[in-house]
Protein backbone atom coordinates (compact mmCIF):
# COMPACT_ATOMS: atom_id res chain seq x y z
CA UNK A 1 0.00 0.00 0.00
CA UNK A 2 1.24 3.46 -0.89
CA UNK A 3 2.49 5.37 2.16
CA UNK A 4 0.69 8.70 2.18
CA UNK A 5 3.37 10.12 4.43
CA UNK A 6 6.04 9.57 1.78
CA UNK A 7 7.78 12.42 0.00
CA UNK A 8 5.22 13.72 -2.50
CA UNK A 9 8.06 14.63 -4.85
CA UNK A 10 8.79 10.93 -5.36
CA UNK A 11 6.80 9.11 -8.05
CA UNK A 12 4.57 6.33 -6.82
CA UNK A 13 5.00 2.94 -8.52
CA UNK A 14 2.28 1.34 -10.60
CA UNK A 15 1.96 -1.39 -7.97
CA UNK A 16 1.41 1.11 -5.16
CA UNK A 17 -0.88 3.54 -7.00
CA UNK A 18 -4.54 3.94 -6.06
CA UNK A 19 -6.93 1.60 -7.86
CA UNK A 20 -9.21 4.33 -9.23
CA UNK A 21 -12.59 3.64 -10.80
CA UNK A 22 -14.30 2.85 -14.08
CA UNK A 23 -16.62 5.87 -14.03
CA UNK A 24 -15.33 9.08 -15.61
CA UNK A 25 -15.80 12.53 -14.10
CA UNK A 26 -18.68 14.60 -15.51
CA UNK A 27 -17.69 17.90 -17.14
CA UNK A 28 -19.70 20.89 -18.39
CA UNK A 29 -21.29 20.70 -21.82
CA UNK A 30 -19.62 23.91 -22.97
CA UNK A 31 -16.48 25.93 -22.34
CA UNK A 32 -17.13 28.69 -19.79
CA UNK A 33 -15.15 31.31 -21.75
CA UNK A 34 -15.91 30.71 -25.43
CA UNK A 35 -19.03 28.51 -25.13
CA UNK A 36 -17.79 25.89 -27.58
CA UNK A 37 -19.05 22.35 -26.98
CA UNK A 38 -16.55 20.54 -24.76
CA UNK A 39 -17.19 16.91 -25.67
CA UNK A 40 -17.44 14.67 -28.69
CA UNK A 41 -19.97 11.85 -28.95
CA UNK A 42 -17.58 9.43 -27.22
CA UNK A 43 -17.14 11.72 -24.22
CA UNK A 44 -13.65 12.92 -25.11
CA UNK A 45 -12.51 16.45 -25.87
CA UNK A 46 -14.18 17.86 -29.00
CA UNK A 47 -11.74 18.29 -31.90
CA UNK A 48 -13.32 19.76 -35.06
CA UNK A 49 -12.15 18.47 -38.43
CA UNK A 50 -8.77 19.93 -39.37
CA UNK A 51 -7.95 20.90 -35.79
CA UNK A 52 -5.25 19.38 -33.59
CA UNK A 53 -4.76 18.83 -29.89
CA UNK A 54 -1.81 19.30 -27.54
CA UNK A 55 -1.25 18.31 -23.91
CA UNK A 56 0.94 20.13 -21.40
CA UNK A 57 1.81 20.07 -17.70
CA UNK A 58 3.29 23.26 -16.30
CA UNK A 59 2.30 23.49 -12.67
CA UNK A 60 -1.11 24.38 -11.25
CA UNK A 61 -3.55 23.80 -14.08
CA UNK A 62 -5.72 26.81 -13.28
CA UNK A 63 -3.15 29.30 -14.52
CA UNK A 64 -1.88 26.99 -17.23
CA UNK A 65 -5.30 26.72 -18.83
CA UNK A 66 -5.77 30.50 -18.87
CA UNK A 67 -2.46 30.96 -20.69
CA UNK A 68 -3.77 28.90 -23.58
CA UNK A 69 -7.44 29.88 -23.83
CA UNK A 70 -6.31 33.50 -24.36
CA UNK A 71 -4.45 32.64 -27.58
CA UNK A 72 -5.85 33.30 -31.05
CA UNK A 73 -6.40 30.01 -32.83
CA UNK A 74 -7.14 28.03 -29.67
CA UNK A 75 -10.60 26.50 -29.95
CA UNK A 76 -10.91 24.68 -26.62
CA UNK A 77 -9.03 24.09 -23.41
CA UNK A 78 -9.74 21.77 -20.51
CA UNK A 79 -7.85 20.72 -17.41
CA UNK A 80 -7.31 17.21 -16.19
CA UNK A 81 -4.91 14.52 -15.12
CA UNK A 82 -2.47 12.40 -17.13
CA UNK A 83 0.79 10.45 -17.12
CA UNK A 84 0.04 8.43 -13.99
CA UNK A 85 -1.48 5.05 -13.21
CA UNK A 86 -4.89 5.52 -11.57
CA UNK A 87 -7.92 5.43 -13.90
CA UNK A 88 -10.40 8.30 -13.52
CA UNK A 89 -8.68 9.90 -10.51
CA UNK A 90 -10.15 12.67 -8.38
CA UNK A 91 -8.38 15.89 -7.43
CA UNK A 92 -7.67 14.92 -3.83
CA UNK A 93 -6.28 11.59 -4.99
CA UNK A 94 -3.94 13.31 -7.43
CA UNK A 95 -2.83 15.78 -4.75
CA UNK A 96 -2.00 12.88 -2.43
CA UNK A 97 0.75 11.77 -4.80
CA UNK A 98 -0.75 8.28 -4.87
CA UNK A 99 -1.84 8.27 -8.53
CA UNK A 100 1.32 9.36 -10.35
CA UNK A 101 -0.73 11.78 -12.44
CA UNK A 102 0.27 15.28 -13.47
CA UNK A 103 -2.05 18.29 -13.56
CA UNK A 104 -2.38 19.03 -17.28
CA UNK A 105 -4.18 21.23 -19.78
CA UNK A 106 -5.40 19.89 -23.10
CA UNK A 107 -5.49 22.41 -25.94
CA UNK A 108 -7.51 22.10 -29.15
CA UNK A 109 -6.15 24.47 -31.79
CA UNK A 110 -6.45 25.46 -35.43
CA UNK A 111 -3.03 24.86 -37.03
CA UNK A 112 -3.94 27.31 -39.80
CA UNK A 113 -3.95 30.08 -37.17
CA UNK A 114 -1.50 28.96 -34.49
CA UNK A 115 1.16 26.27 -34.83
CA UNK A 116 2.26 23.63 -32.36
CA UNK A 117 5.61 25.43 -32.23
CA UNK A 118 3.77 28.59 -31.15
CA UNK A 119 2.12 26.66 -28.33
CA UNK A 120 5.50 25.29 -27.25
CA UNK A 121 6.88 28.82 -27.02
CA UNK A 122 4.04 29.76 -24.66
CA UNK A 123 4.61 26.56 -22.69
CA UNK A 124 8.32 27.16 -22.15
CA UNK A 125 8.03 30.86 -21.32
CA UNK A 126 5.09 30.47 -18.93
CA UNK A 127 6.75 28.35 -16.23
CA UNK A 128 10.10 27.26 -14.86
CA UNK A 129 10.89 23.88 -16.44
CA UNK A 130 14.01 23.29 -14.32
CA UNK A 131 12.36 22.57 -10.97
CA UNK A 132 11.66 18.85 -11.13
CA UNK A 133 8.64 17.79 -9.09
CA UNK A 134 7.43 21.28 -8.27
CA UNK A 135 6.52 24.64 -9.73
CA UNK A 136 7.24 27.65 -7.56
CA UNK A 137 5.78 27.03 -4.11
CA UNK A 138 3.63 24.16 -5.39
CA UNK A 139 5.42 20.91 -4.61
CA UNK A 140 4.57 17.37 -5.66
CA UNK A 141 4.69 15.05 -8.64
CA UNK A 142 1.44 16.54 -9.95
CA UNK A 143 3.24 19.84 -10.61
CA UNK A 144 6.02 18.50 -12.82
CA UNK A 145 6.77 19.97 -16.23
CA UNK A 146 5.62 17.75 -19.06
CA UNK A 147 4.86 17.67 -22.77
CA UNK A 148 2.64 14.79 -23.90
CA UNK A 149 2.75 14.33 -27.64
CA UNK A 150 0.16 13.38 -30.26
CA UNK A 151 0.82 12.41 -33.89
CA UNK A 152 4.18 13.86 -35.06
CA UNK A 153 4.68 16.22 -32.12
CA UNK A 154 7.43 14.31 -30.31
CA UNK A 155 10.35 15.40 -32.49
CA UNK A 156 9.14 19.01 -32.50
CA UNK A 157 8.86 19.02 -28.72
CA UNK A 158 12.31 17.46 -28.27
CA UNK A 159 13.90 20.03 -30.59
CA UNK A 160 12.20 22.86 -28.71
CA UNK A 161 13.49 21.48 -25.41
CA UNK A 162 17.04 21.43 -26.72
CA UNK A 163 16.76 25.02 -27.96
CA UNK A 164 15.24 26.37 -24.76
CA UNK A 165 17.60 24.39 -22.55
CA UNK A 166 20.55 26.14 -24.17
CA UNK A 167 18.87 29.52 -23.73
CA UNK A 168 18.34 28.76 -20.04
CA UNK A 169 21.93 27.62 -19.54
CA UNK A 170 23.19 30.75 -21.27
CA UNK A 171 21.06 32.75 -18.83
CA UNK A 172 22.53 31.03 -15.78
CA UNK A 173 19.68 28.62 -15.12
CA UNK A 174 19.73 24.88 -14.53
CA UNK A 175 19.02 22.06 -16.97
CA UNK A 176 15.43 21.41 -18.04
CA UNK A 177 13.68 18.56 -16.20
CA UNK A 178 10.59 18.43 -18.43
CA UNK A 179 9.36 14.96 -19.34
CA UNK A 180 8.47 14.51 -23.01
CA UNK A 181 6.57 11.35 -23.90
CA UNK A 182 3.78 10.11 -26.15
CA UNK A 183 0.42 11.36 -24.94
CA UNK A 184 -1.11 9.06 -22.30
CA UNK A 185 -4.80 8.83 -21.46
CA UNK A 186 -6.25 12.22 -20.51
CA UNK A 187 -8.78 12.26 -17.66
CA UNK A 188 -10.95 15.35 -17.21
CA UNK A 189 -10.72 17.14 -13.88
CA UNK A 190 -13.84 18.03 -11.92
CA UNK A 191 -16.20 20.70 -13.28
CA UNK A 192 -15.19 23.36 -10.77
CA UNK A 193 -11.60 23.23 -12.04
CA UNK A 194 -12.57 23.88 -15.65
CA UNK A 195 -11.76 27.49 -16.66
CA UNK A 196 -11.37 28.17 -12.94
CA UNK A 197 -9.74 31.59 -13.24
CA UNK A 198 -12.50 32.85 -15.55
CA UNK A 199 -15.05 31.94 -12.88
CA UNK A 200 -12.79 33.19 -10.07
CA UNK A 201 -10.68 36.07 -11.46
CA UNK A 202 -8.99 36.64 -8.11
CA UNK A 203 -8.14 32.98 -7.68
CA UNK A 204 -4.71 31.56 -6.96
CA UNK A 205 -2.23 31.26 -9.81
CA UNK A 206 1.32 30.24 -8.92
CA UNK A 207 2.49 30.14 -12.52
CA UNK A 208 5.68 32.05 -13.27
CA UNK A 209 8.38 31.84 -15.91
CA UNK A 210 12.13 32.39 -15.86
CA UNK A 211 12.07 35.62 -17.93
CA UNK A 212 14.21 33.82 -20.53
CA UNK A 213 12.70 34.20 -24.00
CA UNK A 214 12.36 31.22 -26.28
CA UNK A 215 14.92 31.63 -29.10
CA UNK A 216 13.44 32.64 -32.43
Language-model segments: which ranges?
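Flexible coil/turn and secondary-structure edge motifs
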Residues: 1-216
Amino acid sequence: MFNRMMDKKTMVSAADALAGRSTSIAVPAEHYVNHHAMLNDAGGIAVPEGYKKALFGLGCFWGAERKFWQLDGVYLTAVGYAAGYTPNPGYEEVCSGATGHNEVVIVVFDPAVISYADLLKVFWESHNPTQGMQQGNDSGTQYRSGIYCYDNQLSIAEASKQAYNQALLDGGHREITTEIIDAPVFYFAESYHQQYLAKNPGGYCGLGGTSVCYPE
